[in-house]
Amino acid sequence: MSVSIVREQSITISDGIRLDSGRILAPITIAYETYGTLNTDASNAILVEHAWTGSAHLAGKQSENDTKPGWWDAIVGPGRLLDTDRYFVICSNVIGSCFGSTGPASINPKTGKRYNLTFPVITIRDMVRAQKLLIEMLGIRRLLSVMGGSMGGMQTLEWITQYPDAIASAVLLATTPRPSPLAISMNAIARWSIFNDPTWRKGEYKNNPKDGLALARAIGHITFLSDESMQAKFGRKFSARDGQFDFFGQFEVERYLDYNGYSFVSRFDANSFLYLAKALDLYDVSWGYESMAEAFARVSAPLQFFAFSSDWLYPPGQTEEMVSCLRKLGKEVEYHLISSSYGHDAFLLEHEAFSPLVKRFLDAAYAKGGQ
């Protein structure tokens, strides 16, 4: 059963936070949604981390007229993986994004204008630093679990290394300890698409630079898929409306990318896209440490990792590198390689493949009372 109508909430922290860059971002607003009820000792809270272009709207609908539920609706609700009769589930929008939390589209209180490119560069660690303040303000000392895929997995890595005493377990899916040169290259091309749109105006646009942002999204979307899934979905079919010898005729896959690119423009801010892409590229779990091993030496919670066989953006070997390091340190870690043809997006599309394993893992954490 899905959750019922949910409402977005927010908190504002007037003192803000000190960022990894050394700058102070203040005030900050954090948008979030919750599902279920926090128990009396606040031991049943699970924080779910969203990916690059996600939001706090994890599940359910925000009004009766909503046509689409939240981005991971299938796993949240009574009797589902994240059972809201048992757990208090939280999802917040990261700072730097554009769905209610402070980002480049927010108003700078010092100028009364949008931050745009005066917004400071942020890191994944900065995002989690803000989340930690939210969790404390909700009266939660220790999270039963933190769970996330892709960029959400990077945030989860920061929780297990920066705040090991604040979590009792963690689930990480389709993530990486650091993006590869290939991943950075794809993001670079996406950035250039926006930079070269004349309507971007170095971030000072009135309306989203639609052509640049649509192309950037299409480039990113390709990295979320796989050759196998694209062959199955599209093959080499031409659009029924386009002739093979029409110069502007399109393959079905082209029409798909065109639709996904331009539909994205209406819901996401171009500058936020750029700032979050920068945060992704900068990410390295060992930043500030001598090595990954030194970072992972801080881990105290049991961990569960998932990789997906056809994910070429953050391929299984990158997860296996982390798992190997953690096991050498004697940490409690599970690893599951899921056979899938869906590429990087498998963590969103094939929850049935990992849900029983995650349920067992969370059941064990819950049985310990979040200790």
Curated annotation (Swiss-Prot):
Residues 44-350 form the AB hydrolase-1 domain. It catalyses: L-homoserine + acetyl-CoA = O-acetyl-L-homoserine + CoA. InterPro entries: AB_hydrolase_1, AB_hydrolase_fold, HAT_MetX-like. Substrate binds at residues 217, 345. The active site is at 150 (nucleophile), 311, 344. Its main location: cytoplasm. It is an enzyme of class 2 (transferase). The keyword Lipid metabolism does not apply. It is found in: Cytoplasm. Pathway: Amino-acid biosynthesis; L-methionine biosynthesis via de novo pathway; O-acetyl-L-homoserine from L-homoserine: step 1/1. Belongs to the AB hydrolase superfamily. MetX family. Transfers an acetyl group from acetyl-CoA to L-homoserine, forming acetyl-L-homoserine. HAMAP family: MetX_acyltransf. NCBIfam families: homoserO_Ac_trn, PRK00175.1. This is Homoserine O-acetyltransferase. The lineage of its organism: Bacteria, Pseudomonadati, Thermodesulfobacteriota, Desulfuromonadia, Desulfuromonadales. The gene is metXA.
